[in-house]
Amino acid sequence: MIIYRDLISHDEMFSDIYKIREVADGLCLEVEGKMVSRTEGNIDDSLIGGNASAEGPEGEGTESTVITGVDIVMNHHLQETSFTKEAYKKYIKDYMKSIKGKLEEQRPERVKPFMTGAAEQIKHILANFKNYQFFIGENMNPDGMVALLDYREDGVTPYMIFFKDGLEMEKC
């Protein structure tokens, strides 16, 4: 399994269990997820290692809740955040500088294609700004990558967009 981590915050963003494809001439990775529902808070008696008490009503004190969301977000503990268009422009400008700096250190051959492609991709993001939900890694580092969540034309299938050069891969 390959875990994709944010190059800046080192937060886990997604893994290779999803359908991943390169978009925007290899600048971004598009990761397709699905809507899932999970029950949380319900404790299975077999995990306790004892018998259920014969006293009192069954299940007293434990309430279960069903949480519905996008599997990528839930599995990797991504945190939703929000931006105005102006705030996103400021964030993305600083983020691009950070990634450019990392690329200059680690992969200088990627600097020019990244900066050229990123400018085009940012125009596309800003043109479709109202369609996106924004997610950051579990540690909520404001300097880290902000992943974009959108839905396919069917309105049901979620997908997320990540800047490929802002990710590091870790084999597990």
Swiss-Prot record:
Keywords, A to Z, come to: Calcium, Cytoplasm, Phosphoprotein
Q: Which Pfam families match?
A: TCTP
Provide the Gene Ontology terms for cellular component: cytoplasm; cytoplasmic microtubule; extracellular space; multivesicular body; spindle pole
The subcellular location is: Cytoplasm
Keyword Glycoprotein among UniProt keywords = no
- What InterPro entries does the record point to? Mss4-like_sf, Mss4/transl-control_tumour, TCTP, Translation_control_tumour_CS, Translational_control_tumour_p
Its main localization is cytoplasm
Positions carrying Phosphoserine are: 46, 53, 64
The residues the entry assigns to the signal sequence are: none
The ranges of region (Required for reduction of TSC22D1 protein stability) come to 70-172
Reading the lineage from the top rank, the first entry is: Eukaryota
Give this protein's Gene Ontology molecular function annotations: calcium ion binding
* Domain TCTP stretches: 1-172
PANTHER family given in the database record: TRANSLATIONALLY CONTROLLED TUMOR PROTEIN-RELATED (PTHR11991), TRANSLATIONALLY-CONTROLLED TUMOR PROTEIN (PTHR11991:SF0)
User: What subunit structure does UniProt give?
Assistant: Homodimer. Interacts with STEAP3. Interacts with TSC22D1; interaction results in the destabilization of TSC22D1 protein.
Q: Which family does it belong to?
A: Belongs to the TCTP family.
- Its function? Involved in calcium binding and microtubule stabilization. Acts as a negative regulator of TSC22D1-mediated apoptosis, via interaction with and destabilization of TSC22D1 protein.
This chain belongs to the protein called Translationally-controlled tumor protein
